[in-house]
């Protein structure tokens, strides 16, 4: 009787169901009789509706399907021989030790009087399947996450969220954001905004279909111009702003401006774009490609607008050279096209005229007033009033960093950046918060901290409901759910979700240790390591055990030590 119960299928997926007690102890006829009995009880695995018709017999070990019991029996003999862990009681073999241990509890609990008894609480059951389900109740108490609505417990939070959506849906008052189109309600505002994009796309399709009407097949015939020719030349019109396009793909790409959709993502940094040309132009930053060369000087540019801005420098230089002839140079005769036109004298070279009496001192033709932009950048065409501003700007193109930190040797392109960096070593924090008194080394950090005192948190994560005061914090937090890691180390290829983690990781390759201990000569790459190290110098405030008097450097070691006294 016991051996026959061991051959029953184990419910709920705790162990694989079995059809044979040994590799070669039963014939196909015996197996067929046993299978018919199991089918009458409704416990056969082959009766599952999820299995393919015609191949209803499945192996309990490798999950393969077979058209008949004989083929399954022949396969099971070979499959069981490969399983490494046999049961000493009935000969059944298992692939994993936990399944064998659970199976042996069935033999230990089976008695002729009480049936199957639980070895934890002593409760007895008629069948071993009920015992296995009961053992699951004991293991459920070890699960750390409990449902707040019922007594069920889970190993992971995503299992709890799925359980809450399925068994405990939120009440209507807990979902205050209602869609005006379909009446669907949401708990978070961001979820409603994302849902409304579906209706926007549908409305655009319907409006475009009504405006255009049924279009004839084939290429339209060329007709004479008629009123409303723009509608003929640009038949595809946006239903939101009225802008018209010649081709439907252009309209589809334009509609993403209204819907907020950005389907084109950069594989290097994760930034998203509405159109593929924007992505192509952006990727040149990573590849270093510069396809637009200057015909005058040969300098290459990444984007065409930068080339056009740069070409103006050559035009201005040519114009100034033509407008400023030498003092003794002869006057060239004007060409046939230039003779009728009046020459345009340059303003700086034109002699100043005497102002009429009563004229204001700021006369437009006053030669003393120079143009505001005197110094232009040869790379991008930007102009500056002072030469030092131009030199500071040109460091962005050349990569020059003349300001070096005396503590760690790090270089900077601007002196203000060096001053802000030096506060890391000195510990100076001149910017203080008026609300809580907290101090910061940079003004931008203080400005970001002041928003923490604001009562509202408008940016809500649609996955877990966590709220943030700043949109970049929400974007960085959402990478936890999406698993996106856009920041890649160029030395080893390891990827990170936060840029600060990449900066901290790169110190492993560079050997940089910016955090130095003021009490000794040691330095550290992480600030947390410096804080832990400095506790070793603080002997007066060390963590002391009140029972034996032993001291420790940190509180965690003291708590671990005190557990020995509790035992």
From Swiss-Prot:
Description of how the protein assembles with itself and partners: Homodimers and homomultimers. Found in a complex with RIP60 and RIP100.
Bias kind Polar residues: ranges: 22-50
Keyword Endoplasmic reticulum attached: no
Record's protein name: DNA-binding protein REPIN1
Induction cue: Expression is increased in bone tissue of osteoporosis patients.
Positions of transmembrane segments: none
Biological process terms in GO annotation: regulation of fatty acid transport; regulation of transcription by RNA polymerase II
Modified sites of kind N6-acetyllysine: 33, 276
Entry keyword annotation includes Acetylation: yes
Subcellular location(s) per record: Nucleus; Cytoplasm, Cytosol
Species, as recorded: Homo sapiens
Role, per record: Sequence-specific double-stranded DNA-binding protein. Binds ATT-rich and T-rich DNA sequences and facilitates DNA bending. May regulate the expression of genes involved in cellular fatty acid import, including SCARB1/CD36, and genes involved in lipid droplet formation. May regulate the expression of LCN2, and thereby influence iron metabolism and apoptosis-related pathways. May regulate the expression of genes involved in glucose transport.
